[in-house]
């Protein structure tokens, strides 16, 4: 024995040095772990997070749970998890599931932990399942256990405990019920619920835990202890394997605690047992912990004592083993410490065990029911939310279908009413008098034979874009419907465009077309005004033709263009009055807007005449009862026109801008029938141009054949396309006027913002001597659009319109300030720009309060 002990000392020293080197190596490499993490290694936090996600197992993920047994720490079940049979140990408290320090343990003789369930009410530990059960159960059965199997089990238990101690884990509850047999008949040490992680080599105070029959004396006495408590428990397990009996059977628990603690009670050894095995058991059951060998020594000793076991044959082993069991049963303990005097279990003890088992089962069933009720509640709540989502989705689908149906209906209703939005015309520079077109013009009253507009025609810039023949969108920059008195709301852009002929000769020629009186036509709602910048056909070749082919001469406005036809401005707002006369109630309503063709004077305007005090003479739109005269060129035969007449004008050449070198005298000599107006002198100032226009004399134009006149001032003679004259018609009172100009009632001519004398303002009034409406022919002019020269000039005009008695400089400053806040101008913008507000106020509260109020858009 001494030699064996001496030989065992060398491995002990080797293990000591090996452990020292291992600690040194671990300490050195631990310093470089943070640095190595920067070179491809995962951070520690990410590793822990990934492990935590796999460590937590939901209890409902485990299926087919079956009860296996119960103990002091809880019941044990087996079930299926991820196509694997697992053991589920149900514990009573959450802290018992805190075994993260054990999940890294990987040994063939240590049970593998798969995860924990830390969700209330089922606190469980999921581990590897061993189908053959506990070691104590296998030993008590009459199964055949060979010598090799017995020797292997002893060695495997020692190997497993040695692995735990190397990892600083103290089991503290090593016993045969916590040693399982796998399907391969290998040992699996389990039940680490009472294990302790040893952080120091010194002995520590441990709590009273474990089963008293396998408990070390120092633990019973609550003395400082270390890993040697597991060695004592291992000695008790060896005695149990040798005798196949429960240690200290039929002895009360308190008697075991007292007897083991005071060294009065011990386990007797069979006399016929192998000497080496008996010596190992006695060393492990030493009263002092320092006298017990470590598991590394136990492994070495067993390798020495094992040949003695194999000296016997298998039959001799089985006979000797049975005799060891009979010896254990014959052990007599004092009657004062036994429970039932060494007899079999009483009926009361069996009933008590049955009640405990039933109580554990009922508690488990209660917890499972509570868990599934909570899950059912969550499922019902999710179902209600999902049902609400489906209901909301159906409502939204119904609303969407209704909205699409209404949208289709609106598009069908406004298919002929809503013009499309088109891009603005390109910008080009013009100075002086402009000749947008020189051509022979054909006029026709047949709508079906309309000539499509030419792509790039300058006459498409008011209600239609210069780049396409479709109508513009309402309230867009170039749309004439923005400030129409008859247009109340915005309309969809889904309306159909005007028909464009597919004839290439018509599409790409210089011809153009206009529609008089149609909804959305240029004659009704375009910027054909004294400042719109569009060529006036009434004073040029249209007037010259004088009703050729039965056409009605169309009226266009003219002005001095500064930055081309692409610059658009805001429209004007016109006010409307109800017809007070009862005689006019049956007549169709007439809409009037500023800058419409009806406001353009068609006769000679006398700038020197004083401003009339009568509203009838001051209004731009003529009275319904005003004298009318039907022109000779009208093809309506004095009949009521059911719909608008169209005028198609075919152009032979493109328009050109006149030069100051044009010879007016030579042209007048060649065409004596044409009376020419004085040409506007070239100037770089808009104010000077307006003043020069006011100083020129008006010349009435006569029709000629195919020669364009020189352009006149913005205020000149115009031909009304719907002009009807009646004789001996008396002038009505101002109260019979249907519509009055919201601008003429509160301002003078266009250049009154720059006139320094009040006398010039009185002489610059625009008076219409003709009417745009008769009983035979009535047209509705809905929209208008005014193109200003620049933002500053536009602002000055607004300031003059809102004259409140201030000086000219104050009015200009106020206009500029208002323009900066409210006016936005772009040269070419196809999108509709919504302005903040357009306001017009009456300049005279006493005179025009009934006719012109504040209009806001």
Curated annotation (Swiss-Prot):
Compositional bias segments (type: Acidic residues): 753-762
GO cellular component terms, semicolon-separated: cytoplasm; synapse
Keywords: ATP-binding, Kinase, Magnesium, Metal-binding, Nucleotide-binding, Serine/threonine-protein kinase, Synapse, Transferase, Ubl conjugation
E.C. number(s) listed in UniProt: 2.7.11.25
Ranges of biased composition (kind: Low complexity): 467-488
Principal subcellular localization: other
Active site: 173 (proton acceptor)
Top enzyme class: transferase
Domain of life: Eukaryota
Cofactor(s) named in the record: Mg(2+)
A GO MF label: MAP kinase kinase kinase activity
InterPro entries (alphabetical): Kinase-like_dom_sf, Prot_kinase_dom, Ser-Thr/Tyr_kinase_cat_dom, Ser/Thr_kinase_AS, Ser/Thr_Kinases-Pseudokinases
Catalytic function, reaction form: L-seryl-[protein] + ATP = O-phospho-L-seryl-[protein] + ADP + H(+); L-threonyl-[protein] + ATP = O-phospho-L-threonyl-[protein] + ADP + H(+)
Subcellular localization, as worded in the UniProt entry: Synapse
Modification after translation: Ubiquitinated by rpm-1. Negatively regulated by ubiquitination by fsn-1 bound rpm-1, followed by degradation.
Binding site for ATP: 68-76, 89
Residues of the Protein kinase domain: 62-304
Family: Belongs to the protein kinase superfamily. STE Ser/Thr protein kinase family. MAP kinase kinase kinase subfamily.
Name this protein carries in UniProt: Mitogen-activated protein kinase kinase kinase dlk-1
Species for this entry: Caenorhabditis briggsae
Gene that produces this protein: dlk-1
């Amino acid at each position: 024995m001494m030699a064996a002990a001496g030989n065992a000392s060398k491995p002990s020293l080797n293990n000591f040095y090996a452990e020292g080197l291992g600690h040194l190596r671990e300490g050195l490499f631990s310093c470089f772990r943070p640095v190595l993490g920067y070179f491809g290694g995962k951070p520690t936090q990410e590793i822990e997070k990934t492990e935590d996600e796999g460590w937590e197992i939901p209890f409902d993920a485990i299926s087919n749970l079956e009860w296996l047994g119960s103990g002091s720490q809880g019941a044990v079940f087996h079930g299926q998890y991820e196509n694997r049979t697992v053991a589920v140990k149900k514990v009573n408290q959450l802290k018992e599931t805190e075994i993260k320090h054990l999940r890294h343990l990987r040994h063939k003789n240590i049970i593998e932990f798969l995860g924990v369930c830390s969700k209330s009410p089922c606190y469980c530990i999921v581990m590897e399942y061993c189908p053959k059960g506990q070691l104590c159960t296998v030993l008590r059965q009459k199964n055949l256990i060979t010598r090799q199997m017995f020797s292997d089990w002893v060695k495997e238990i020692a190997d497993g405990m040695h692995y735990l101690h190397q990892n600083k884990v103290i089991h503290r509850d090593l016993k045969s019920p916590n040693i399982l047999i796998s399907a391969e008949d290998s040992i699996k040490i389990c039940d680490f619920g009472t294990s302790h992680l040893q952080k120091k080599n010194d002995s520590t105070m441990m709590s009273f835990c474990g089963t008293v029959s396998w408990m070390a004396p120092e633990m019973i006495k609550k003395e400082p202890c270390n890993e040697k408590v597991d060695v004592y428990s291992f000695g008790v397990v060896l005695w149990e394997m040798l005798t196949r009996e429960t240690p200290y059977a039929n002895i009360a628990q308190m008697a075991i605690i007292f007897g083991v603690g005071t060294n009065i009670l011990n386990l007797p050894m069979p006399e016929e047992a192998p000497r080496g095995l008996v010596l190992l058991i006695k060393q492990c059951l030493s009263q002092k912990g320092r006298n017990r060998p470590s598991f590394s020594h136990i492994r070495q000793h067993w390798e020495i004592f094992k040949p003695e076991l194999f000296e016997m044959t298998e039959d001799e082993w089985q006979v000797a083993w049975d005799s060891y069991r009979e010896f254990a049963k014959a052990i007599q303990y004092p009657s004062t410490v036994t429970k039932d005097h060494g007899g079999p279990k009483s009926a009361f003890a069996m009933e008590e065990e049955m009640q405990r088992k039933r109580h554990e089962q009922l508690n488990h069933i209660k917890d499972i029911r509570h868990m599934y009720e909570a899950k059912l509640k969550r499922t019902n709540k999710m179902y209600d939310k999902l049902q609400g989502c489906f209901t909301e989705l159906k409502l939204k689908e119904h609303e969407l279908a209704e909205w699409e149906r209404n949208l289709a209906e609106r598009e069908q209703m406004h298919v002929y009413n809503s013009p499309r939005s088109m891009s603005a015309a390109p910008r080009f520079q013009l100075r002086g008098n402009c000749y947008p077109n020189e051509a022979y013009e054909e006029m026709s009253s047949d709508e079906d034979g309309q000539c499509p507009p030419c792509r790039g025609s300058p006459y498409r810039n008011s209600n239609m874009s210069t780049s396409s023949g479709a109508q513009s969108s309402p309230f867009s920059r170039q749309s004439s419907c923005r400030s129409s008195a008859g247009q109340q709301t915005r309309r969809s852009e889904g309306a159909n465009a005007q028909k464009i002929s597919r004839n290439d000769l018509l599409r790409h020629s210089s011809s153009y077309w206009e529609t008089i009186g149609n909804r959305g036509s240029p004659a009704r709602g375009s910027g054909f005004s004294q400042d719109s910048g569009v060529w006036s056909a009434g004073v040029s070749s249209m007037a010259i033709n004088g009703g050729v082919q039965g056409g009605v001469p169309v009226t266009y406005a003219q002005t001095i263009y500064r930055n081309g036809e692409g610059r658009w401005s805001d429209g004007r707002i016109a006010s409307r009055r109800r017809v007070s006369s009862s005689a006019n109630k049956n007549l169709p309503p007439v809409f009037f807007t500023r800058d419409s063709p009806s406001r353009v004077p068609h006769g000679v305007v006398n700038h020197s005449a004083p401003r009339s005090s009568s509203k009838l003479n001051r209004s731009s739109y003529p009275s319904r009862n005003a004298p009318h005269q039907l022109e000779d060129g009208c093809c309506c035969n004095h009949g009521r026109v059911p719909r608008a007449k169209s005028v198609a004008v075919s152009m032979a050449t493109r328009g050109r801008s006149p030069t100051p070198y044009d010879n007016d005298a030579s042209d007048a000599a060649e065409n004596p029938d044409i009376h020419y107006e004085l040409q506007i002198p070239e100037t770089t100032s808009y104010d000077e141009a307006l003043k020069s226009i006011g100083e020129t004399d008006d010349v009435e134009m006569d029709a000629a054949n195919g020669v364009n006149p020189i352009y006149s001032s913005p205020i000149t003679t115009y031909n009304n396309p719907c002009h009807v004259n009646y004789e001996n018609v008396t002038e009505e009172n101002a109260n019979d006027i249907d519509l009055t100009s919201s601008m003429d009632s509160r301002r003078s001519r266009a250049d009154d913002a720059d006139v320094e004398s009040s006398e010039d303002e009185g002489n610059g009034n625009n008076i219409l001597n003709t009417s745009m409406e008769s009983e035979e022919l009535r047209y509705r002019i809905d929209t208008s659009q005014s193109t200003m020269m620049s933002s500053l000039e536009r602002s000055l005009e607004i300031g003059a319109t809102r004259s409140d008695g201030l000086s000219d400089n104050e009015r200009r400053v106020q206009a500029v300030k208002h323009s900066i806040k409210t006016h936005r101008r772009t040269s070419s913008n196809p999108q509709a720009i919504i302005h903040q507000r357009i306001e017009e106020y009456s300049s005279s509260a006493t005179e025009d309060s009934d006719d012109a109020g504040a209009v806001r858009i």
